[in-house]
Every structure is written in C-alpha cells, then in structure tokens.
C-alpha cells in the first residue's frame, strides 16, 4: 500500500511509518516535527514564524506540496487541524486530499472538539484534563483558552466537519477511544501507539549514569535543571520530569513537581531531581537516560508516549495506570505503572513509597520493558493499522 501520514504528535506517525516499511509498504510522513520537538519526517512542512512573510511562505509551501500529496491508498491525518493554519484555511486542503486519494483517516490522538466536549460532561471520566469528578476545570486559564478555541470556535467547527466526513478514526489511548465511541462507534477503533524498542537481549541501561549534580539552579544540556543531593549520597533515586512551557497546569506537571519537591525536601539524601523544560526530542531522550523514575501526566488514565519511551529505557513511570488502561490492552499480568490520583498528596505518598522502598524498582523496570514489548512493537502496531485501513469501507464523500 501507498500511505501518507500527515502531521505528527509524539513521534507516533514516524514510528508507525517505520513499522509499515518493515512490512513492505510505502509510507511518507509530512510534518513540522511537532514544533520544537523536532521529530523525524520525510517532508518538512514547518512554519518559521507567525510573521506576515513567513506566513505567506508557509501557505505557498503547502500549496506547492499538493501535487505530491495525491494518489495514496490511505491518508491519515494526525488531527483535524493538521496544518499550522487557521481552521477555515485548512478545510480546502482537506477537501483536496479527500478528492485525490483513497481512504481518509483522522487520528484521535490529542486535543479536539469531541475531547473537550466529552470531558466537560464530568461523567465519562472520573478525572481528566477538564474535570475532577463532578467539578469542571473549565475556569483554569489554559483550559478556558482551549474551550474557547475547540468547543466554541472555528477549530471546533472544522473538527466536526472532518470527523463526520472521514472514513475511520484510530484512537491511540483508552481515553480517546472512550470519547469517540460515544460519537462515531461504527468507525472508531483502538490501536496502541507504536514505539521503537531496544533489541531483545540489548536491555536498556538501568544503572544511573555518572552525572554529577551541579550547584542549585544551574542548567546542563540546554534545558535540564539538576536539583543537587545534600551530603553527596548517590545511593538514592533519580527522578525525571519534563515540563512544556504553557501546558504545565493543563498536564498537571505543576502539581507533580510540587509533590516531588516535597519529597526531596523530606529526603534530601535519597533523591535527585532532573527537570527538562521544552527541549527537542533527541535531547529529551539523552537527558532521561540514567534516571530511575519518570513523572508523567497527572490527569491521564493511561501512559502516553513519554511514559512509554521511559519504560523502554528502563525507567519506572509515575502517572496514569488505571484499570481501564490494562483492560483495553487485555493485559492481566503486568502492572508496571505507579498510578496516581489527581492530588498533590497522593503523588507525594506514591513518590515517598518509592524512596522508602527502592527494592521494588528493579521489578517495576523489568515489567515496564516487557509491557512496551508486548503492546507497542512498531511492526505489530502497523499490522493493526493495516487491518483497520483495509477493513474499513469507504464512506460517501461530502
């Protein structure tokens, strides 16, 4: 098959393309690298800035690329807003792709109209990016902006139009599947995210790298801040937390960082904290290496790509590991994720337990590696995508 993957989040499309190629298919990834993260792609479609001339150049780049974006058996968009343009300008590009290619699929991989609307019902999820129990998080500044854009604005209208028209919707996490099953059950399926894995027999390094802490507030590797140990004791745990500027409250990393700092203050000789703030993907992976524990998202039921990457590298993940995550995978044995509830105190207690009982770390690391090998192998995931694409009947085009 000839497959076009347009846009990328968390390296999902690039890793999927590599799995498809191993199966003998032709896969092309066109993306901007997910902004500053710099993910690999075959065709670079990056907007340099929002200035007038760079905006005109970007539109011209999109138009000039169109002749190369036709004749594919399958086109999969990472999101209804798959170009860095205003929603009303994206729709003509969607129509062009729809008319000149085979089947059209749109991923449920991130922020969109249906995600916001469903989370705000405060019933579908016990907690999410937009609710904790019956309490809405709509008044938080970052969430207010997302609601205005996706629920009440042009982005939402584009999303509804595209999702109603497309042939199928693969959901990459349990939460996205739970949302889209309510709206488009006949054309939604769950497929785990693909992840590049260490080779069998080539286990990831699970001993701490020899990185000496710097004095407080110093930075290393371009974006890492190391909060040093007191007393020089390196027998404790190294905790790693990645922070995206502007999304800390939305993802809950602000709460997790506060809990982690409390643990460090209480056990200064037993833990080290490494923070990475908005660094490119390859640099992020290097900075993560040698840590013991990754703090992931607070309001998630499931591990997203950063957490899966950490487990593949031999880290323990603290984040989303609710029963629904294991059930949708059919996983009845492994429980590698330290599940946390959306409260600072719960995160503190779970982290404190790891510090006080480090003997559980080796088992969690081994289970994490086996977990990603079982469920996120790129070739196995690519096979599931191929089955979904081939079995999905084409819909009448609007």
Describe each PLM feature range.
Residues 359-390:
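A charged, aromatic-enriched C-terminal amphipathic alpha-helix characteristic of glycosyltransferases
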Residues 191-195, 199-201, 235-251, 257:
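Conserved donor-binding/catalytic core segment of Leloir-type glycosyltransferases
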Residues 289-302, 315:
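Acidic donor-binding loop of glycosyltransferase active sites
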Residues 160-165, 169-171, 176-195:
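Helix-loop-beta element that forms the nucleotide-linked donor phosphate-binding surface
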Residues 316-323:
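Short hydrophobic beta-strand element within catalytic cores of glycosyltransferases
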Residues 39-41, 45-46, 106-152, 246, ...:
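Acceptor-binding helix/loop patch of EC 2.4 sugar-transfer enzymes
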Residues 63-66, 70, 93-99, 129-168:
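Membrane-proximal helix-turn-helix segments that form the acceptor-binding/catalytic region
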């Amino acid at each position: 098959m000839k497959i076009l993957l347009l846009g990328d989040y968390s390296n999902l499309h690039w890793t999927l393309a590599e799995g498809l190629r191993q199966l003998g298919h032709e896969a092309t990834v066109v993306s901007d690298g997910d902004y500053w993260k710099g993910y690999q792609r075959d065709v670079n479609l990056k907007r340099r800035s929002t200035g007038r001339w760079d905006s005109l150049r970007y539109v011209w780049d999109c138009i000039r690329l169109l002749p190369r974006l036709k004749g594919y058996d399958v086109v999969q968009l990472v999101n209804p807003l798959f170009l860095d343009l205003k929603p009303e300008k994206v729709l003509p590009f969607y129509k062009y792709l729809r008319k000149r290619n085979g089947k059209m699929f749109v991923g449920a991989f991130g922020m969109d109209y249906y995600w916001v609307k469903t989370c705000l019902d405060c019933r579908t999820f016990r907690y999410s990016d937009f609710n904790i129990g019956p309490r809405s998080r709509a008044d938080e500044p970052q969430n207010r902006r997302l609601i205005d854009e996706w629920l009440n604005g042009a982005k939402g209208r584009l999303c509804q139009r595209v999702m109603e028209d497309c042939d199928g919707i693969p959901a990459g996490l349990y939460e996205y599947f739970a949302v889209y099953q309510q709206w488009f059950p006949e054309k939604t399926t769950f497929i785990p995210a693909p992840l590049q894995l260490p080779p069998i027999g080539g286990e990831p390094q699970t001993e701490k790298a020899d990185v000496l802490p710097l004095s407080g507030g110093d930075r290393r590797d371009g974006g890492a801040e190391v909060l040093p140990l007191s007393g020089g004791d390196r027998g404790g745990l190294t905790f790693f937390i990645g922070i995206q500027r502007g999304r800390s409250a939305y993802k809950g990393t602000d709460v997790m960082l506060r809990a982690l700092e409390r643990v460090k203050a209480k056990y200064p000789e037993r833990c080290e904290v490494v923070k990475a703030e908005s660094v490119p993907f390859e640099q992020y992976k290097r900075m993560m290496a040698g840590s013991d524990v990754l703090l992931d998202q607070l309001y998630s039921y499931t591990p997203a790509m950063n957490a899966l990457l950490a487990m593949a590298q031999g880290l323990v993940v603290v984040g989303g590991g609710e029963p629904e995550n294991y059930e949708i995978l059919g996983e009845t044995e492994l429980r590698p994720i330290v599940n946390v509830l959306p409260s600072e105190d719960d995160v503190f207690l779970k982290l404190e337990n790891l510090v006080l009982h480090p003997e559980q770390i080796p088992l969690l690391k081994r289970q994490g590696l086996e977990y990603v090998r079982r469920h996120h192998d790129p070739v196995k995931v690519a096979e599931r995508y191929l089955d979904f694409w081939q079995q999905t009947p084409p819909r009448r085009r609007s």
